[in-house]
Amino acid sequence: MKVQSFDALYDEDSLMQKASRQEFSKYVDHIGTEGMQARSGLLQERQYPHLNALVDELMRQNPRLNDSLKERLELLRTGEAQVVITGQQTGIFGGPMYAVYKLLTCLKVARQTEELLNRPVLPIFWLATEDHDFDEINHLIVPTHDFRTRKLAIQAPDSISRSVSRLAFDQTAVKDIVRQALCTERETPYTKELLALSDRLIESSTTYGEFFASFMGELVDHDIIFFDADTEAVRQLEIPFFERLIQDNAEIRQALSKGIQETTELPDTFLNEEAAHLFVEDIGRDLLYPGQDFVTKQGKTYTELELLALLYASPERFSNSVVTRPLMQDYLFPTLAYIGGPGEIAYWTRLRPLFHHFDWTMPVLIPRMGAVMLQARDEKGLRRHGLSLEQVLHTGVPLTPFDAAAIKRHLHDATLLGTVLVEEVTRIEQQELRTTAVATKLNKQLQLAVETIVDQKRRLHEQANRSDRALQYQLAPDHAPQERIHSILPWLNRYGLNLVQTLRMHYEQTEAEQLKIML
């Protein structure tokens, strides 16, 4: 493996480029090394009375943590340790590759920050199991025979909107998908090992969150702490802050509107200014809307007192929206930094006034690592076309349509020459008083020769185009970023289960955050 900096991965005005620059400080509270130090000092002044119980729950959720990380996690009980957090929906086999890149960034930032602050810094991966959009996590993308994208998806168990954590984990369907996905790949020395690992992890998992954490943990020797907020133990810890979110709901919505107004020049993100930004579980997971009382989309109403009573009786029925989850994260954990992609950074900037409402500052926002992986054959394909990787990512691999008419026009001169030959042969035949239809026979042979040449050229063209479509699929499938479409699964099949650990080693040795990875 060879890793190089690749700044052309994102546009110059992308938040993946801007968010690390000093000019971005007008949208955030802390930035850079000094910002991390300032944030750490402020966290020391805050109280986290629930940390002992939180560590117990983290230990329960992460039985396979390596010994070094377990020892450092114990230091969170007293607040000596602080944390760096990233998060993602729990897609099967890790979802898109950028989830792996988030995880690696979290590990790297935690290590660097630990050295900077001279205190334990823990990497936390927040599992978005509260999310109810099953279609976001239920699939892998694989290539079709002509290198278009195709979804291999698990059917939703029912039509009711439920948190992913509440859905039955379909072991049979997930096993079927991994086999279908690997059928699109060549068998390698790693295939059987990958299948055996997949089957073992699938059979030991009862939820999609568990499977995600088990699979991703295996890739980095269980050197990261996964956190599932949608458990009864965590909901008990969250009661005091849910109470604040209910009681201060009007002020929170006003703060969100202010945050949106202050960041109009940043990329747009849809954050619902009308919602209460809390979900309650009834028949399914339903978003609350404020009014004289709180109302669900299904029309069920709750007074503030009724919601508070329900909260204390059944906290497991409550969950956060995309707006309130970052606030709950800051309530639960002494959070130094959050690692996110461009969309997350865009909406986090809108939340600044909400943090200030609680007399907090925002964590440091750090763009995740971005990357594109190239195989040796991909580099050969680029050289064959005389293309740079940047050109392919921005404009794609040029595919020329097959033009049979043009080829036939090109062969026209040869056909004319053949016609003259036929006429001469015919004249000689007639002089010799032969009566066979030689001219007709020769003309047919000429036409057959033309069609044969056209067919041969068509096959060569299709072969070249197939190779070009394969190159496009590998680097920018359907003209989308590789990291947003590809799963890590086929790459593990090609290069082995140590691939991510090898990438981690190279990534932690470079200062670059946008990478070209040559395999």
From Swiss-Prot:
InterPro entries: Bacillithiol_biosynth_BshC, CC_BshC, Rossmann-like_BshC. It comes from the Bacteria. It holds the Pfam family CC_BshC. Residues 51-71, 440-464 form a coiled coil. One of its GO terms (molecular function) is ligase activity. Its EC number is 6.-.-.-. Involved in bacillithiol (BSH) biosynthesis. May catalyze the last step of the pathway, the addition of cysteine to glucosamine malate (GlcN-Mal) to generate BSH. Belongs to the BshC family. This is Putative cysteine ligase BshC. It comes from Exiguobacterium sibiricum (strain DSM 17290 / CCUG 55495 / CIP 109462 / JCM 13490 / 255-15).
